[in-house]
């Protein structure tokens, strides 16, 4: 069993062990992907993220 979550109406995470939320949608995994220092594809992922503006440094700053 893996910990999973879904977003409620207030966009807050609700953690569960089920694969579907009460609304019927799929839940998301609460665990990050595994990391390997020998990752051969990280260079290409960074290139793609730069191209599409997905790096954290490329996001607009939000004012709270």
Curated annotation (Swiss-Prot):
Q: Which domain of life is it from?
A: Eukaryota
Q: Does the keyword Cell membrane apply?
A: no
| Name of the protein | Putative H/ACA ribonucleoprotein complex subunit 3
Briefly state the protein's biological role.
Required for ribosome biogenesis. Part of a complex which catalyzes pseudouridylation of rRNA. This involves the isomerization of uridine such that the ribose is subsequently attached to C5, instead of the normal N1. Pseudouridine ('psi') residues may serve to stabilize the conformation of rRNAs.
**GO terms, molecular function:** snoRNA binding; telomerase RNA binding
What does the UniProt keyword field contain? Nucleus, Ribonucleoprotein, Ribosome biogenesis, rRNA processing
Does the record carry Ligase as a key word?
no
Q: Which family does it belong to?
A: Belongs to the NOP10 family.
Q: Which species is this record about?
A: Caenorhabditis elegans
The subunit field of the Swiss-Prot or TrEMBL record says:
Component of the small nucleolar ribonucleoprotein particles containing H/ACA-type snoRNAs (H/ACA snoRNPs).
Q: Name one GO cellular component term.
A: box H/ACA snoRNP complex
Q: Where does the UniProt annotation locate this protein?
A: Nucleus, Nucleolus
An example Pfam family from this entry, by short name, is Nop10p
Q: Name one GO biological process term.
A: snRNA pseudouridine synthesis
Traced from the root, the source organism's taxonomic lineage reads:
Eukaryota, Metazoa, Ecdysozoa, Nematoda, Chromadorea
In terms of InterPro entries, this protein maps to: H/ACA_rnp_Nop10, H/ACA_rnp_Nop10_sf
